[in-house]
Amino acid sequence: MSEFLPFSRPAMGVEELAAVKEVLESGWITTGPKNQALEQAFCQLTGNQHAIAVSSATAGMHITLMALKIGKGDEVITPSLTWVSTLNMISLLGATPVMVDVDRDTLMVTPEAIESAITPRTKAIIPVHYAGAPADIDAIRAIGERYGIAVIEDAAHAVGTYYKGRHIGAKGTAIFSFHAIKNITCAEGGLIVTDNENLARQLRMLKFHGLGVDAYDRQTWGRAPQAEVLTPGYKYNLTDINAAIALTQLVKLEHLNTRRREIAQQYQQALAALPFQPLSLPAWPHVHAWHLFIIRVDEQRCGISRDALMEALKERGIGTGLHFRAAHTQKYYRERFPTLSLPNTEWNSERICSLPLFPDMTTADADHVITALQQLAGQ
């Protein structure tokens, strides 16, 4: 236990090394057959019709908003308690992010908060499946259908998350992340699933310069026909090196998430006797992927502030995370929306702390965290 226990560590093994070696020796290392296999695997996992692999979930959000023609004068509803890339992409396209509050105990954006924020300018709704649990997506999607507004699910935390018996992303449009701390990772990467064929076609163009084909298609066809720009696009394709790692991780998903679940249960049992408050679980039927294990550290209740707790854990060789600092409290958005008040978001943003949670953690590692929390409670 002398080594520092990080907040997260990717679970990499000989299988990932072998997958990378195979790609390196194949003669084709950029976007190619491994991308195609990854996309097919995600269609099988989710049950959706189309999958588009991209260089990051942020890239996926960017081109999805672009494909939906989100721009100047439009509004997009999203929680403030999310990673800032969503707000940034909305803003960079000239649209206005309309930040709404979340449930105080699940941190999920609610259908009621979404519906109350709709105006004639609303073009999209971006709910977040938070920490590995699902938002009430049926109710949110029903609002989108009623008002004719697109719903883009932020599923960055939700590889392996199920809602009412179906994997997140089973219908509609959802964006997953393969960042280094996610449930499956390839260092950097993302993937969009959708049941909209026209949207899928636009996304494939936008992710690769606006061309009608990608580099692998061009090589396979002997560069005939010559590719041409159909619409201005970006360089957001995923390499086959990354895709091969993600595919290997996907095979291990059930094992990886089972281990996360075991650690989460160990935390839950110990926290029942401590003042630190874990998140509540959603009321609807679901399978939690346990991307994060979050506690709320209320100084009056716990005898220690969140920041002091994080520092004290660090001194004991334990890393933590903060998911997330509310976007509307950060400089750019604070100055842009100076009167915005989101009480539940703000209360949680000042108190949330993510404990170490990753598949290679041992029971002794989790016990080390629990012992430290027991020592610090009431200080």
From Swiss-Prot:
GO terms for cellular component: membrane. Homodimer. Gene3D superfamilies: Aspartate Aminotransferase, domain 1, Type I PLP-dependent aspartate aminotransferase-like (Major domain). GO terms for molecular function: pyridoxal phosphate binding; UDP-4-amino-4-deoxy-L-arabinose aminotransferase. CDD domains: AHBA_syn. It comes from Escherichia coli O9:H4 (strain HS). Its EC number is 2.6.1.87. This is UDP-4-amino-4-deoxy-L-arabinose--oxoglutarate aminotransferase. NCBIfam families: PRK11658.1 (NF008658). GO terms for biological process: lipid A biosynthetic process; lipopolysaccharide biosynthetic process; response to antibiotic. Signal peptide: none annotated. Belongs to the DegT/DnrJ/EryC1 family. ArnB subfamily. Pfam families: DegT_DnrJ_EryC1 (PF01041). Pathway: Nucleotide-sugar biosynthesis; UDP-4-deoxy-4-formamido-beta-L-arabinose biosynthesis; UDP-4-deoxy-4-formamido-beta-L-arabinose from UDP-alpha-D-glucuronate: step 2/3; Bacterial outer membrane biogenesis; lipopolysaccharide biosynthesis. Keywords: Aminotransferase, Antibiotic resistance, Lipid A biosynthesis, Lipid biosynthesis, Lipid metabolism, Lipopolysaccharide biosynthesis, Pyridoxal phosphate, Transferase.
